[in-house]
Amino acid sequence: MWTARLSSIAVLTQVVGTWADTITLNWEITWVNAAPDGFHRPVIGVNGKWPCPPIHATVGDTVVINMKNSLGNQTTGLHFHGINQLDTNYMDGASMVNSCPVVPGSSMTYSFTADEPGTYWYHSHNMAQYPDGLRGPLIIHDDNDPFDGEFDNEVILTISDWYHQQTLTLVQNMLVSSNDQWRPPLPDGMIVNEGGNTDIELDIGTTTRVRILNFGALTAFMLRFGSRDMDVIMTDASYVQRETIHQLRIAPGQRYDVLVSATKKDKGKNIPYLISMDLNRDFTVSGTWTFNQTGYLITDAKAPCTAKEVVQQWRPFDEALFTPLDEMPLLGPLDRTWTLNFALCKDMNNIPRMCFNDQTYVMQKTPTLYTAATVGNANTDPSVYGAVLPFIIEYGDVLEIVINNLDPAIHPFHLHGHQFQVVERPESGSGSFDGSSTANPVPPRRDVISINGGSYARLRITADNPGVFLFHCHIEWHVEMGLTATLIEAPEMLDGYDIPQAMIDSCKAQGYPVAGNAAGDTINVWDDSGYLTDPPSTYSGSQWPVPKGGNSQKSRPRRKPSGQSSQTRQISNMSGEFQHRITW
């Protein structure tokens, strides 16, 4: 069980009359052999160890990570999930969006301010690496925590699906024309605390804050702490009014902070709690459901841990019904509406993809932020960004994002750079938004929301964070299928945006443009002839051991064949691809 222990070099600086630390971490990203569920496989670790270490900071601290890529055969990078990166958009870590990936043998420094408290996590946002292990908790503590004094200690509880094969093989097997059911890789099991200790020490008469994170690539999880209630105090790093519930559903990417207590009646007992993988239509359920795990709330270290927790029916609390602690009212009036219709699709090679508005995200040659920073006033024109499904809003705009889920399954969607208000999220089968629904006057805020099958969700933000931010499904396999769009926020304030020279040099070293439109054209930024529009027919990535010769060939997005239209040919009324690199 992770504890709130800070392992770093801390330098004190005075900020606005208070003391803040600079948390400096030196990380070497390496392959490590691990067996969290008893099956040995290569995983991506830090400084020769796995699980990857937690990061602990306090509001106002500066977090600095000096990262060296020693994988030998794969580019990498770090994204800090839930951190809004105000004024540091280039640190968001999404490959070819905010920066270029970091090649083997080279280094990159990430630096950002821990400006908002909460439970976050970091992970690779490059080539589906985080299911291979590159992920860890990021906790920002609050000296002014409104729940201070209501708990005695805290622990971290991570949950994840787990695969015995490496990501490269899984994605290669998924992106084939014979996969006509759009079947994602199915996990071989689940792990809690990355295969570590699942027990939570809970002394009689005390309350523990449990920080729950779902690191999964595909599945949501159900959680119940035995016969006792849990009090939710935070959702996705947003304080909420204390809500007493019995069961919780945690989607991929989501986090919950809950309080769990032990009373005198628990003396001498070790109380079982149950985590179960959410039943999903992609699974063939056998007679015995094996994807669950029992942990214990330990009130007596000498007492046996033999009792089992049985749940007859999962009925979790609705994640869209929490009330923000500050009771911030619904944003409005609206300035813009961004409607995204999500559905399954296929590309011109009959390979299964996923589409917003009949289009799939295609990674471009120039990082999208670099385009916004270098094309002048043209950065307000969506056409200069290529096939990244761009949507542009001005500073101060109130934006409503409407996502119509045309698929019968539940999908978790995540927005970088913001905590959005969940205006409305109807039950499954409600159909697409018809404009007639009412809004929650005091909506909860979070950065991942599960959208029910055959239904929709409405989300609102104020454009107060200039930058380039992805909006995507947080099922990692669906990101690889292309279920991503791009928010270009306040481009009028991004012209000439100052990007660290080290990041520019990293792009140049790989042959990527650092200025101009999506193709790197600085002369005629409206010339789309060099844009990438085709989904690659092969997927290249990493697999251990490192091939002979050390570093793999430099991977580059595929060029559009000469004379081909800038729009991908549609099959089944769909098109496109996402961020798969090919070797040429």
From Swiss-Prot:
Binding site for Cu cation 2: H81, H123, H474
E.C. designation(s): 1.-.-.-
Residue ranges of the region described as Disordered: 426-445, 536-584
Keyword Membrane: no
Gene Ontology molecular function, alphabetical: copper ion binding; ferroxidase activity
Gene Ontology biological process terms in this record: cellular response to iron ion starvation; melanin biosynthetic process; reductive iron assimilation
Plastocyanin-like domain span: 29-144, 154-277, 364-491
Binding residues for Cu cation 4: H411, C473, H478
Comp. bias regions, Polar residues: 429-440, 562-576
Signal peptide: 1-20
Subcellular location: Secreted; Cell surface
Coiled coil: none
Enzyme class: oxidoreductase
Residues reported in the UniProt entry to bind Cu cation 1: H79, H414
One Gene Ontology cellular component annotation held by this UniProt entry: extracellular region
Positions annotated to bind Cu cation 3: H125, H416, H472
Keywords attached to this entry: Copper, Melanin biosynthesis, Metal-binding, Oxidoreductase, Repeat, Secreted, Signal
Top-level taxonomic group: Eukaryota
CDD domains: CuRO_1_Fet3p (cd13851), CuRO_2_Fet3p_like (cd13877)
InterPro entries for this protein: Cu-oxidase-like_N, Cu-oxidase_2nd, Cu-oxidase_C, Cu-oxidase_fam, Cu_oxidase_CS, Cu_oxidase_Cu_BS, Cupredoxin, CuRO_2_Fet3-like
Pathway connected to this protein: Pigment biosynthesis; melanin biosynthesis
Family, similarity comment: Belongs to the multicopper oxidase family.
Job description of the protein: Multicopper oxidase; part of the gene cluster that mediates the biosynthesis of dihydroxynaphthalene (DHN)-melanin, a bluish-green pigment forming a dark layer in the conidial wall that protects the conidia from UV radiations. The first step of the pathway is the production of the pentaketide 1,3,6,8-tetrahydroxynaphthalene (1,3,6,8-THN or T4HN) by the polyketide synthase PfmaE though condensation of acetyl-CoA with malonyl-CoA. T4HN is not stable and easily oxidizes into the stable form flaviolin. T4HN is also substrate of the hydroxynaphthalene reductase PfmaG to yield scytalone.
Name recorded for this polypeptide: Multicopper oxidase PfmaD
Originating gene: PfmaD
